[in-house]
Amino acid sequence: MLCLPVFIILLLLASPAASNPLKTRIQSDLIRAALEDADMKNEKNILSSIMGSLGTIGNVVGNVCCSITKSCCASEE
């Protein structure tokens, strides 16, 4: 008869619902903040790489145009 109550108590202690709510709340806040920081860093890196690529592509297109015809690089002469 004593086994069943002891088993239930042990089961309740081992269940995830018995965890400390403050600890899980702090952990979830820290995880959310870290994910937001990671998203902001990724956006900045993506935007800077796109802008850098556009400048590089513009230079390549200008060089190709100048090698084909001199009309597009008349401003440089």
Swiss-Prot record:
PTM field: Contains 2 disulfide bonds that can be either 'C1-C3, C2-C4' or 'C1-C4, C2-C3', since these disulfide connectivities have been observed for conotoxins with cysteine framework V (for examples, see AC P0DQQ7 and AC P81755).
Localization recorded for this chain is:
Secreted
InterPro entries the UniProt entry points to: Conotoxin (IPR004214)
What are the record's GO terms for cellular component?
extracellular region
Signal sequence segment: 1-19
In which tissues has expression of this protein been reported? Expressed by the venom duct.
**Which cysteine pairs are joined by S-S bonds?**
none
Question: What are the UniProt keywords, alphabetically?
Answer: Disulfide bond, Neurotoxin, Secreted, Signal, Toxin
The family annotation for this protein states: Belongs to the conotoxin T superfamily.
User: What domain comment accompanies this record?
Assistant: The cysteine framework is V (CC-CC).
What protein name applies here?
A: Conotoxin Ar5.1 b
Q: Lineage of the native species?
A: Eukaryota, Metazoa, Spiralia, Lophotrochozoa, Mollusca
